Amino acid sequence: KLTTGTVNINAQNNEEGTANQNDGTRYTLLSNPYTTYIDVSAFLTTNSADLHSDNGAIYVWDGSSMVAKNSGSGYKVPPAEGFMIGTVGPDGTTRQIDFTTSMMAIDGTDNAISGQMMDENKAIIILKAQQEQTQSYADIYFIEEMTNGFDFLYDSEVFGSWGDNLIYSRLVDNDDGLDLAIQSLPYSEMWEKTVSLGVNAYSGEELVISIKEQTTPADLNIYL
């Protein structure tokens, strides 16, 4: 239901087991209740205490897979668009998720990254893995003030079971086995950075990995 005021929604975590199990039951389906776009960064910051520590993102369906969008993405959620979030456990815990008018954005022009000039001291590489009709993405962001370890709201786990994601990255420092859909790293270290990638491929089928989008400096060489 579209509205113009503050909206509070209860979201329940039904996940059992360890934090890294990620069996999909920590997620809740929400939608933008406003007739305007909402800024993802503002939404995540407002609700950060109620989000699962591994996620810190929303997950949207792009027609073929669930795609993570976090505070580094510059994403704006269109009116009435649905998305998933992962909330804090343990099993059976209910958290209140808030939508406020301060999250409203004028438009969604930042949704399209390719071909645009990005903010100074920010660069993006989006890797795409495709096998038959299945595809998924691993985003690498270079942003000032990020670290090589885990940065909540800027580093985000893949959605659901690891086997559903063809490609992911691992933390440069302090890798604890978390498969990341988005990893944010220091901009100033971009020219000398090595990032570990992982793939899950179906046997007997060709897997194609490519750079879907990038806004990196012209003098940066990328090797896959």
Predicted segment positions?
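Compositionally biased Ser/Thr/Gly- and acidic/asparagine-rich
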Residues: 2-223
